[in-house]
Amino acid sequence: MISALILAAALTGASPIGAHSDPLSGAIEHFRTVEYYRVTIRSIHAGGEEHIRYYYKKPGFVRMEFIRPHAGAVMIYNPDTKRVRLWPFGAGNFPELSLSPENSIIRSLSGMRVDHSDVGTLFENIRALREQGDNEVLGEETLDGRTVLHLIVTGREGVAVADVHSSELWLDAKSQFPAKVISRDIHGAIIETVMMEALEINGKLPDTLFNP
């Protein structure tokens, strides 16, 4: 896993995140060079736990393959049509639904919309929060065998972006992607804990993955 991340960083031109005077801005700049990525997401929140295989293609194509709950379900967002195709029992199987990304039945258990689910949107929300607050860099740590940079971004009193008042991030030192994120509301309660695993960056994904 570590060697794969190092290789991905080399191929994408990522510089070590600790070398950047502003790690969050460095991670955002690097994300702009990313054309594709795939990752396994584990999300824990008050509504339960979700495991998803997640695929992204610029400028915003998203494919989600659900591991739990709803094992086998596939959801694809197309930024050109601004529609979501949903196969509850697997891509190509009946039924296939066409839905708005605003539809409540396809939001995550934590309320996330598929068209707002990519790492770029996460980074932009955190940057907007920092502009109305502050951030603290806690330094390098080891998380699941990976070197990560631990930082916390907190809005001023009463300030929240996308319902989040505080974001605690562990940024992978090589890939500059979040390895873990904990979001909290204005009362300090945890909204969601997200772990990202098995990351691959800029390995070309076939067009048929997003248009089966």
Where are these regions (language model features)?
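Short amphipathic alpha-helical segments that mediate assembly, nucleic-acid/protein binding
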Residues: 4, 24, 102-105, 119
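Sec/Tat-exported extracytoplasmic proteins
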Residues: 31-35, 88, 130-133
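Short linear motifs in intrinsically disordered
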Residues: 27-33, 53-55, 64-65, 73-77, ...
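Short, solvent-exposed helix-to-loop capping segments enriched in aromatics
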Residues: 31, 116-129
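Gly/Pro-enriched, hydrophobic low-complexity segments
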Residues: 70-75, 85, 124, 128-212
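Extracytoplasmic/secreted envelope proteins and their assembly/folding machinery
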Residues: 24-28, 119-123, 168
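N-terminal leader/targeting segments and the immediate start of mature chains
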Residues: 2-51, 56-61, 140, 203-205, ...
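An acidic-aromatic
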Residues: 55-117, 189-192
